[in-house]
Amino acid sequence: MSDNEVAHRALDGKRYLLSGPFDLTTPATSVVELAVSGRRCEITAGGPRLGDDVLAALGATGYDEELVYAGGRLAIARTEPYDPQIRLRENRLTGVWLGKRFSFFTHLYGATSNDLLSVLSGFAIREHDDGIAITPHRPHGFAGTATLVKEVPGLGLLEISPLTPQHTAQLPRWRGMTTQAGELFVDELSDGSPYFVLAGSDTWTTVLPLRDTELAEVPRLVGELRLRTAV
């Protein structure tokens, strides 16, 4: 297979370029946590059907409200899922912003539509050809780094984020396998399942093997992956 290339934008505005002899047509999602208006909320962005898919998974049949907002459409749905651990029904509000090519959603609990609008007013929304970027207004801000999640058939699920000093401190003292995308290390999840960590010059990528992943082939496949940030 000849090399393919794709660009994806994380919610913090960072762009990642992936290339190699892989099927890179699968969509990517991005996740980031924000501290806005006294609340911590998680924003998840993806393709135009992401919000609809989330609502279907929650058992909702449609939206309760729809508004024009920030150059797109804001759809609001309310559900009351039952949590068996605490034996209570939760009052959950789901807000979905739909742009021309991308969308994002967030969940708020015990909240009203005005609460959602207050949260959304804490950051600017900008839709690009390769994804959505949000910029918090002061004094609001990101509560963590944004992660880009993309499935690459044959390789696994990639979770990509900027390399931080905290990441560097987690690396073992020995050197990993050198690849064109960075140093590759292998570790185990709590259930004993293997996963891989790829430490690039400015990226940190977790590679989670999927059902079609041949573990013995992962080092070779990662060696054919090129991953970098771009302006």
Language-model features, listed with the residues they occupy:
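Intrinsically disordered, low-complexity prosegments and terminal tails associated
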Residues: 1-231
